Amino acid sequence: MRNQAITVSAMSLVAIVALAPASAAADQASGTIKLQSKAGPIIVNVANVYMVKGPDAASGKTIRQLIFASADLSAKLQACASMSCASGIVSDGMTVDFDAGPRLNYWVVGNGQKVQYSGTARPDETLKLTADTADRLAGSLAIDDGAMGGATANVKFDAAIAKQFSK
């Protein structure tokens, strides 16, 4: 009887662990993102990157998105139930959408989202990937829209999927 109780308890523990949501842990990234504001330049020293997957807001098509930040956003990302929430947790950093079309869509924010810039970039000119799978993106990204009053970004990253959304 005691062995049965231990077996059932062990099976229950395995089931609980299997059903628990995976942690949306940060992967390491490095580099800088710069954005011009009226008060002067905003510089974000990137330390963390997260890869999320889910439906694009415009098309509904499943896309991959990289979220670059200096702060650890793991807890906030874990609490998100949608892709729009995941994008919205960035207060100083950048999101980059993959698979939404022939260009990369990106959004850069600084000073607690008070300063924003969005644009598109040609992957063949700005992106060098060393890994490109459904569950992992690695490489470097160099965007320079500074001459147009926009953002510049020069980051290296290696990101495994942190979270997948259905909405």
Label each region the model flagged.
Residues M1-M11:
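Bacterial N-terminal signal peptides that target proteins for export
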Residues S9-A20:
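Bacterial N-terminal signal peptides
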Residues A25-V44:
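Short N-terminal segments immediately surrounding and downstream of signal-peptide cleavage
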Residues Q28-S30, K61-Q65, A134-S140:
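Short, hydrophobic/aromatic-rich segments at coil-to-beta transitions
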Residues P41-N45, G119-D124, A151-D158:
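Amphipathic hydrophobic-ligand
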Residues A47-K53:
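A short, sequence-level motif marking secondary-structure junctions
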Residues G54-A131:
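Surface-exposed helix/loop patches within compact recognition domains
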Residues A131-K167:
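C-terminal or internal capping secondary-structure element at the end of a domain, subdomain, or sheet
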